[in-house]
Amino acid sequence: MASLARRPPLLVPAVARHTATVIFIHGLGDTGHGWASAVEQWRRRQRLDEVKFILPHAPSIPITANWGMKMPGWYDIFAIDGSAEALRRNEDEAGILTSQAYFHDLIQKEIDSGIPADRIVIGGFSQGGAMGLFSGLTAKCKLAGIIALSSYLLLSLKFAELVPKPEFNKETPIFMAHGDADPVVNYKLGTMTRDLLKEMGYNVKFTTYPGMGHSACLEELDAIEDFLTERLPKVADKSEQKSEL
């Protein structure tokens, strides 16, 4: 897994001065381009003009649940039957940890370029949301926020052992959302993740979208825009507020 060929991420530059970054990770079988239209949706009200969006592309790997055929994926999936047990059973730990290292490297590169960690949000959808949640909570720096859409906690049975001490993101706001008609990542797995994280003391907000399957909806995208605007306010706005005091 360490020698995987990776394409550079799709970059959507900030419209104004770059002061914050969002790393948004696609799901199984997709590419970063699959979420480019969502980025435009989030930017349409010009509230995120200072934000650069990074949309990574997963490498093409054999997926066991796809009869071993290659497709874009962040880790192998052994079965897709909609059950919580199937996704938690026999997880591809090596693949998960390889992708985790990749996302931690993306975060570090943003920090090295001058973006503070607390001006970085990481998240994604489905497999990408699972990687965003896992990578964010195990990061060795305090992030601005984490987004997990239609996803779940990876390596949940040993997760506590993998979190660095101190826990930099214990209080970091986590935006979780899930459709209650999801046939791929069962809604129960989403609520189990929410409950487990809350039991461990994490700052989770979970929204249910009635009737939604394994997808996103406009209402959900608007909620994400609000979350990003709250977590990554314009630096110019902050400066203006200080000057008025």
Curated annotation (Swiss-Prot):
Pfam families: Abhydrolase_2 (PF02230). It catalyses: S-hexadecanoyl-L-cysteinyl-[protein] + H2O = L-cysteinyl-[protein] + hexadecanoate + H(+). It comes from Neurospora crassa (strain ATCC 24698 / 74-OR23-1A / CBS 708.71 / DSM 1257 / FGSC 987). InterPro entries: AB_hydrolase_fold (IPR029058), LYPA1-2/EST-like (IPR050565), PLipase/COase/thioEstase (IPR003140). Hydrolyzes fatty acids from S-acylated cysteine residues in proteins with a strong preference for palmitoylated G-alpha proteins over other acyl substrates. Mediates the deacylation of G-alpha proteins such as GPA1 in vivo, but has weak or no activity toward palmitoylated Ras proteins. Has weak lysophospholipase activity in vitro; however such activity may not exist in vivo. It comes from the Eukaryota. GO terms for biological process: fatty acid metabolic process. Gene3D superfamilies: alpha/beta hydrolase. Its EC number is 3.1.2.-, 3.1.2.22. Coiled coil: none annotated. One of its GO terms (cellular component) is cytoplasm. The active site is at residues 126, 182, 214. This is Acyl-protein thioesterase 1. GO terms for molecular function: carboxylic ester hydrolase activity; palmitoyl-(protein) hydrolase activity. Belongs to the AB hydrolase superfamily. AB hydrolase 2 family. Keywords: Cytoplasm, Fatty acid metabolism, Hydrolase, Lipid metabolism, Nucleus, Serine esterase. It is found in: Cytoplasm; Nucleus.
